[in-house]
Swiss-Prot record:
Gene that encodes it: der
Chain ranges of the EngA-type G domain: 4-169, 178-353
GO MF term set: GTP binding; ribosome binding
Protein name: GTPase Der
Residues reported to bind GTP 2: 184-191, 231-235, 296-299
Subunit structure: Associates with the 50S ribosomal subunit.
One family name in Pfam for this protein: MMR_HSR1
Any GO BP annotation: ribosome biogenesis
InterPro entries per UniProt: G_ENGA (IPR031166), GTP-bd (IPR006073), GTPase_Der (IPR016484), KH_dom-like (IPR032859), KH_dom-like_a/b (IPR015946), P-loop_NTPase (IPR027417), Small_GTP-bd (IPR005225)
Length: 440
C-alpha cells in the first residue's frame, strides 16, 4: 500500500517551508522572509502515530517571479490537485484573507479531494484573533489554527489529516502476478515503452483501477507469466499541467515504486545518468525493489566496437549502489530488444523471491570467513556465529555476531559478493540484519 501524499498549498510567505521543516524535523527547505525562496528539496516522509505519509511543499515548484504571482499560485494548486490525496491550504492570520488566497481557494474548490485550511502564525491557540474567523469565507468548513514556527496546533492538524487517509486495503492481485513500475525522469520515453510493450504483444491486456487515486493499472498475461504495469494512465498522460513542474512526476514515481515488485528504471541514452535518475534509482534501492536499468533511445547513439560495454560500465559507475541491476539497451521507438524485457522482469522477480536454506548458507559463511578473516579492532575480532534468511523481496539475512561495532561495511559487502557469486540474486538488493548473540 503506497503512503498517502499530502500537499501544502498557499501563496508565498505564509509559512509553508517552516511548517514542512517542523514536521520533517530537519531543516530541508531554505527558509527566508523573501517570497519564493523554497528551491531545495520539496518532499519528505513524515511519521505520526505510527503512520507514514509523503509531504510535499509546493513552494518548491519554481523560483518566484513577481510578474507571474497568480500563475505561480495556480500552478501550485493544480499540482496539489493532480498529485495529492489530501491538500493543506495554508493562509496567514496576520495578513487576513488576500486576493491571492481567494484565487487559490477558487481553484481548490474544483477538486473532489479533501482540503484542510491551516491558519498559520496564530501565537495563542486558546485566544484566536478576530481576523481568524474571516477565513471561513473561503468556504472549506472547519479551520485549523497553527503556528509553524512554535509548533502549536500541529498535533490537531495531523489528526485531522489522518481522518482523510485512504483505508489500508491490501493489493488485490494474486501472488503470481508481478507488479512492474516503469519509472524515469520526464521525456525519457516511459509512455513510448509502455505502449510498445503492451502493443507488440498478442496478449490479454486490460485496464483496471489502481489502488492509488486516479491510477490505472494494466494487466498483461503472456508466455512469461502474469504482469501488472502500475499507473499506466499517469505515464501515458504525462503531465497535463506544465512542463516546468514536471519535477512532480518524481512523486508519482515513488508511489509506483512502493507498490512494485520490479522497477524498470529508464535512462536516456543521449543524456546518460542524470541527478534525477540517481534519485529515482536510489529510492528503488532504498525500498528494496528488484530493478532493471533500461537505457532507451539506443538507436540515437553512434556505435563502434565496445560502445555498449563501455556505456554499461559508465552506468554502473554512476549508479554504484545498484551494481546488481542488469542493464538492457533498447529503443522504444524501433522496438529494438523490447521483446527481452518480459523475460528479464520474470528473472529478477524470481531472484528477489529466492530462499536459501540455513544449512547451505552456513556452509558458505564458513568458507567465506576462512578465505577472508572477519575484521578486528583493538585486539577484538568479529565473530559471526551463523546466518539465516529472514525474508524475501528483497532477500534479507540475519547475521548473529559477537559485537556490532566490529562489523565493517566493507566486510558486509564481501559477504554480499559471496552470496551473489554462489546464488545469483541478480537484479535485487540484499539486506543484512545484525544481531548480537546474547552472552552466555
Amino acid at each position: 500500500m503506497p503512503k498517502p501524499v499530502v500537499a501544502v498549498v498557499g501563496r508565498p510567505n505564509v509559512g509553508k517551508s517552516t511548517f514542512f521543516n517542523y514536521l520533517v524535523g530537519k531543516r530541508i527547505s531554505i527558509v527566508e522572509d523573501t517570497p519564493g525562496v523554497t528551491r531545495d528539496r520539496i518532499y519528505a516522509e513524515v511519521e505520526w502515530r505510527n503512520k507514514k505519509f509523503t509531504l510535499i511543499d509546493t513552494g518548491g515548484i519554481e523560483p518566484y517571479s513577481e510578474d507571474k504571482i497568480m500563475q505561480q499560485m495556480k500552478r501550485q494548486a493544480e499540482i496539489a490537485i493532480e498529485t495529492a490525496d489530501i491538500i493543506i491550504f495554508m493562509v496567514d492570520v496576520k495578513d487576513g484573507v488576500t486576493a491571492s488566497d481567494k484565487e487559490v481557494a477558487t481553484l481548490l474548490r474544483k477538486t473532489k479531494k479533501p482540503v484542510i485550511v491551516a491558519v498559520n502564525k496564530v501565537d495563542k491557540i486558546g485566544e484566536l484573533p478576530a481576523d481568524f474567523y474571516e477565513f471561513y469565507n473561503l468556504g472549506f468548513g472547519e479551520l485549523m489554527a497553527i503556528s509553524s514556527i512554535h509548533g502549536l496546533g500541529m498535533g490537531d492538524l495531523l489528526d485531522e489529516i489522518f481522518k482523510y487517509f485512504p483505508e489500508e486495503d491490501a493489493e488485490d492481485y494474486d501472488e503470481d502476478v508481478i507488479k512492474v513500475a516503469v519509472v524515469g525522469k520526464p521525456n525519457v520515453g516511459k509512455s513510448s515503452l509502455i505502449n510498445r510493450i503492451l502493443g507488440e504483444e498478442r496478449v490479454i491486456v486490460s485496464d483496471i483501477p489502481g489502488t492509488t487515486r486516479d491510477a490505472i493499472d494494466t494487466f498483461v498475461e503472456n508466455e512469461h507469466g502474469k504482469f501488472v504495469f502500475i499507473d499506466t494512465a499517469g505515464i501515458r498522460r504525462q503531465s497535463k499541467i506544465n512542463e516546468k513542474i514536471e519535477k512532480y512526476s518524481i512523486i508519482r514515481s515513488w508511489t509506483a515504486i512502493e507498490r512494485a515488485d520490479v522497477c524498470l528504471i529508464l535512462i536516456d541514452a543521449k543524456e546518460g545518468v542524470t541527478e534525477q535518475d540517481t534519485k529515482i534509482a536510489g529510492y528503488a534501492h532504498e525500498q528494496g525493489k528488484a530493478s532493471i536499468i533500461v537505457v532507451n533511445k539506443w538507436d540515437l547513439i553512434e556505435k563502434q566496437t565496445g560502445t555498449l560495454e563501455e556505456y554499461r560500465r559508465t552506468v554502473h559507475e554512476k549508479l554504484g549502489f545498484m551494481l546488481y541491476a542488469p542493464v538492457i539497451f533498447i529503443s522504444a521507438l524501433t522496438g529494438q530488444r523490447v521483446d527481452r524485457i518480459y523475460g528479464l522482469i520474470k528473472h529478477v522477480a524470481d531472484q528477489a523471491a529466492m530462499r536459501i536454506s540455513t544449512g547451505v548458507l552456513n556452509d558458505l559463511l564458513n568458507e567465506a570467513t576462512a578465505m577472508v578473516q572477519p575484521p578486528s579492532d583493538k585486539g577484538k575480532r568479529l565473530k559471526i556465529y551463523y546466518m539465516t534468511q529472514s525474508s524475501v523481496k528483497p532477500p534479507s539475512f540475519v547475521l548473529f555476531i559477537n559485537n556490532m561495532e566490529l562489523m565493517h561495511y566493507s566486510y558486509e559487502r564481501y559477504l554480499e559478493n559471496q552470496l551473489r557469486k554462489s546464488f545469483g540474486f541478480e537484479g535485487t538488493p540484499i539486506k543484512f540484519i545484525l544481531r548480537e548473540k546474547e552472552k552466555e
